[in-house]
Curated annotation (Swiss-Prot):
<dbReference type="InterPro" id="IPR023620">
    <property type="entry name" value="SmpB"/>
</dbReference>
<comment type="function">
    <text>Required for rescue of stalled ribosomes mediated by trans-translation. Binds to transfer-messenger RNA (tmRNA), required for stable association of tmRNA with ribosomes. tmRNA and SmpB together mimic tRNA shape, replacing the anticodon stem-loop with SmpB. tmRNA is encoded by the ssrA gene; the 2 termini fold to resemble tRNA(Ala) and it encodes a 'tag peptide', a short internal open reading frame. During trans-translation Ala-aminoacylated tmRNA acts like a tRNA, entering the A-site of stalled ribosomes, displacing the stalled mRNA.</text>
</comment>
<dbReference type="GO" id="GO:0005829">
    <property type="term" value="C:cytosol"/>
</dbReference>
<protein>
    <recommendedName>
        <fullName>SsrA-binding protein</fullName>
    </recommendedName>
</protein>
<dbReference type="InterPro" id="IPR020081">
    <property type="entry name" value="SsrA-bd_prot_CS"/>
</dbReference>
<keyword id="KW-0694">RNA-binding</keyword>
<keyword id="KW-0963">Cytoplasm</keyword>
<dbReference type="GO" id="GO:0070929">
    <property type="term" value="P:trans-translation"/>
</dbReference>
<dbReference type="GO" id="GO:0003723">
    <property type="term" value="F:RNA binding"/>
</dbReference>
<dbReference type="Pfam" id="PF01668">
    <property type="entry name" value="SmpB"/>
</dbReference>
<comment type="similarity">
    <text>Belongs to the SmpB family.</text>
</comment>
<dbReference type="InterPro" id="IPR000037">
    <property type="entry name" value="SsrA-bd_prot"/>
</dbReference>
Length: 152
């Protein structure tokens, strides 16, 4: 069964900089002007991550551009946004984040089938420099293989 996703923003750097061990979907609390701006595709999650404050998770450094037609009722572009998860999921993830070396990174932001904005989060562990080099070599080898197959 395929799921409908209208992708707003993706964090391709996260897949290069981190080992993604677990993925999860979370809702996000937004203001009206933020939703309108997202419908226009004006968002960036390149540097965004999730952190906990007590028993809640927030998304930090997510840039959603101001909506031009919202005038004085506009939002702050980089404000912390609350993430919506079930309590059991949240406790489990917060426990894993507290382990040294793990972080919760935003991988993509999209509209689901019901036109709700969702954020795909990844429980990630940072890659070392030699790991990054290895992944670059692997991508180059895959690219060369596909070229050789096409030439034959």
């Amino acid at each position: 069964m395929t799921r409908y996703k209208k992708v707003i923003a993706q964090n391709k750097k996260a897949l290069f900089n981190y080992f993604i061990e677990e993925r999860l979907e979370a809702g996000i609390v937004l203001k009206g002007s933020e939703v309108q701006s997202l419908r226009q595709g004006k968002a960036s999650i390149e540097e965004s991550y999730a952190g906990d404050t007590g028993h809640e998770l927030f998304l930090y450094n997510c840039h959603i551009a101001e909506y031009e037609k919202a005038n004085k009722f506009n939002h702050a572009t980089r404000r912390p946004r609350k993430l919506l998860l079930h309590t059991k999921e949240m406790k489990k993830i917060i426990g894993k984040i507290k382990i040294k070396g793990y972080t919760l990174v935003a991988l993509s932001m999209y509209f689901n089938k019901k036109n709700k904005v969702k954020v795909e989060l990844g429980l990630a562990k940072g890659k070392k420099l030699y790991d990054k080099r290895e992944s670059i070599k692997e991508k180059d080898w895959q690219r060369d293989q596909s070229r050789l197959i096409r030439q034959k």
